[in-house]
């Protein structure tokens, strides 16, 4: 071994690093720590550098295919002393099943949102619609009856003739309703009822 009393020459320095590879700026990779502002130099060999680049490109391609699941706020608070109940942890723990070994979250199948049943609303609206439709003929017949009685009392010849034609057409329609129901089925509300022809009990006044 050379003496260390004098100045150290470059040839003597080579004796102290027989297996150390010369530093190359292209092989010096700075990896950022989780804490901001902390950088650590890491020396990688040529094979390790290639494998790192290949693994990084595969991870980037996988990120494009698989959607990243956002980490829940409760998962961030785990291990920090924050009190979390089992009820609040059910949903985050259920999503942890989709986590791969490399830490990438993949969404396999999203739980379907519970749909509110619209049956009561539809039933209520249809019931109110049927009630209104059934009240319209009654109102129309009551108004028509009052108008017809006033016209007959006044003795207007043209008005009485028009009313007579209208009443005869209505009676004809009532007689044809059973045949029309068999040929053209309608809603069950009308089918359940037995439609009977309504005959005039009193003869209509002649014009």
From Swiss-Prot:
It is found in: Virion. InterPro entries: Corona_nucI (IPR004876), N2-like_embe-CoV (IPR044311). GO terms for cellular component: virion component. Keywords: Virion. The gene encoding this protein is included within the N gene (alternative ORF). Structural protein that is not essential for the viral replication either in tissue culture or in its natural host. This is Protein I. It comes from Turkey enteric coronavirus (TCoV).
């Amino acid at each position: 071994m050379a003496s260390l009393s004098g100045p150290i020459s470059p040839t003597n320095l080579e004796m102290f690093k027989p297996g150390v590879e010369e530093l190359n700026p292209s092989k010096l990779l700075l990896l950022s720590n989780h804490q901001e502002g902390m950088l650590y130099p890491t020396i990688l060999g040529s094979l390790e550098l290639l494998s790192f680049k290949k693994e990084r490109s595969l991870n980037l391609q996988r990120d494009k295919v698989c959607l990243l699941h956002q980490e829940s706020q409760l998962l961030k608070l785990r291990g920090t002393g924050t009190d979390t109940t089992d009820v609040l942890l059910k949903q985050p723990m259920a999503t942890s099943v989709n986590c791969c070994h490399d830490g990438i979250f993949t969404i396999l199948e999203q739980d379907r949102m519970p749909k509110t049943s619209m049956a009561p609303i539809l039933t209520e609206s249809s019931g109110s619609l049927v009630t209104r439709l059934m009240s319209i003929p009654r109102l129309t017949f009551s108004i028509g009856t009052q108008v017809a009685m006033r016209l007959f009392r006044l003795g207007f010849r043209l008005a009485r003739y028009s009313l007579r034609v209208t009443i005869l057409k209505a009676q004809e329609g009532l007689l044809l309703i059973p045949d029309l129901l068999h040929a053209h089925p309608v809603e069950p509300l009308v089918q359940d009822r037995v439609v009977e022809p309504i005959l005039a009990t009193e003869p209509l006044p002649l014009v």
